[in-house]
Amino acid sequence: MIIATLAQKSAMASQYSDYGVSVTWWCVDEERTEAAASMNAVLRKAILDDETVNPVGDINTVITEEMLAKVTEINITTSMDATGLTLDGLDLCTNLTKLSINAWQVSLGDIDLSAFTKLTDVTMSPTAGYTSIQLPDGIKSFKSIIKYANHEPVGPTTLDLTQYTDLEYVSVMDSYGEPAALKSLNVSGLSKLALLYVGGTPEVNIANCPLLTTCIKNN
């Protein structure tokens, strides 16, 4: 990649073409239209820090439609400053296939991911929990790990995953030794579920899961 001005690109591009050399140009003075102004600041930073989406890093602070189309994964880790995290603007990432939220001392409310038709892998683990969650119909992997770390989680208190018939893997851990916020987990009737990890939840319904040969429950 060559970072240059439009004038420099105009003057030099033909030289590379003449020698059959493929070059990606980033023109610092090229006008770019912001397409994610309404997006939560934490999500924006995660996208701008993704080199596959924004290869020039801090040089660019604009998220364009073209960049949004390239976003297939968003990963918020506990090492990041996730203060003020919401999922506002996440719907702009229409090609999202994987979402991982591991945010320290963050709680989220009612989460609705049902419109994300390409999303198959979700980790929803803000350490202070979330109220409820709706997943996409095509979800295959779901992880939810809620930790007590000098704060009380807001939930969830129940998880009924029975409508998500493509689920193959579920990992739900809660509390790490404290009384669990999650009181019940229902995965009954999931014909594709093959692996289940559960921790801290007193009631788990695994009836009629024909492929489920491994269910690891830690109290």
Specify the residue positions occupied by each region the protein language model found.
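N-terminal capping/linker segments that flank leucine-rich repeat
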Residues: M1-Q105, D110-I146, V154, D160-Y169, ...
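Intrinsically disordered, low-complexity Ser/Thr- and acidic-rich flexible linkers and loops
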Residues: Y148-P153, S175-P179
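Tandem repeat scaffolds
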Residues: G177, L195-L196
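Active-site lining segments of carbohydrate-active enzymes
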Residues: G199
